[in-house]
């Protein structure tokens, strides 16, 4: 699910999904009609191609813990399903995402930097621009603390939810993205990072790592 904030409000939340194999097509299509702007794709090729078309106009991509999960996952799936040449669509100027290793909580992780298009991990924005320590930095906990909303609860694994209750799976996915959009609507940390970058004549991602830049701006 994506939230495209440059679209009219009723079209901003868009969900692309594949139906569970055992679910009849007619039933999957009916479930999709219960949600706005929800598209059942024929296969993963179509899903990834549509996703890349939707983000074409995006200057900034953001997600919760997206540096360590969403970005590497979707770039790697694009390589495997569509081919490496298609990953240039994540970037500008016909460049390709650049693989980068980094250490988080003592563990080495791998992500991709998107050339020409900015990616800001909202979890890292939240940790950087709030001045209180939270017991948990899960989206569920932050959503409840900041806007009084939580993720949709479910039992078992996400894979089990997908196969046993496709409607709830879609609702869960959409709520995750809606939570993030509402958080930024309140906190405006993407705007803050943008203002700091312009004020200090640095690239947006620099505001995530350069303490001196932030202190100078404040």
Regions found by a protein language model. Give the residues of each.
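Intrinsically disordered or highly flexible coil/loop and linker segments, enriched in small
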Residues: 57-61, 131-135, 152-153, 178-179, ...
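Common nucleic-acid-contacting/processivity interface regions adjacent to the catalytic cores
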Residues: 159-218
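Conserved DEDDh/DEDDy metal-dependent 3′-5′ exonuclease domain
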Residues: 15-133
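Entry/capping segment at the start of metal-dependent catalytic domains
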Residues: 1-9
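Generic recognition of stable, solvent-exposed alpha-helical segments in well-folded globular domains
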Residues: 46, 50-53, 69-73, 117, ...
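C-terminal or mid-to-C-terminal helical accessory/interaction module adjacent to the motor/catalytic core
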Residues: 129, 134-167, 173
């Amino acid at each position: 699910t994506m939230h495209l904030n440059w679209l009219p409000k009723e079209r901003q939340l868009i969900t692309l999904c594949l139906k569970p194999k055992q679910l009849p097509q007619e039933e999957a299509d009916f479930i999709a009609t219960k949600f706005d702007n929800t598209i059942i794709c024929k296969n993963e090729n179509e899903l990834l191609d549509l996703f890349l078309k939707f983000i074409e106009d995006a200057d900034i991509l953001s997600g919760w813990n997206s540096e360590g999960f969403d970005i590497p996952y979707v770039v790697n799936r694009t390589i495997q399903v569509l081919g490496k040449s298609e990953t240039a669509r994540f970037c500008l100027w016909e460049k390709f995402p650049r693989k980068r290793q980094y250490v988080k909580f003592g563990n080495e992780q791998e992500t991709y930097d998107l050339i020409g298009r900015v990616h800001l991990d909202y979890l890292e924005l939240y940790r950087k621009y709030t001045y209180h320590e939270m017991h948990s930095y899960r989206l569920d906990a932050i959503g409840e603390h900041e806007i009084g909303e939580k993720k949709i609860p479910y039992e078992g694994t996400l894979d089990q939810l997908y196969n046993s209750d496709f409607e709830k799976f879609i609702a869960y996915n959409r709520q995750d993205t809606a939570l993030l959009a509402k958080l930024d609507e309140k906190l405006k940390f993407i705007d803050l990072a943008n203002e700091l970058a312009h004020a200090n004549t640095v690239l947006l991602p620099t505001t995530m790592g350069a303490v001196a830049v932030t202190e100078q701006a404040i």
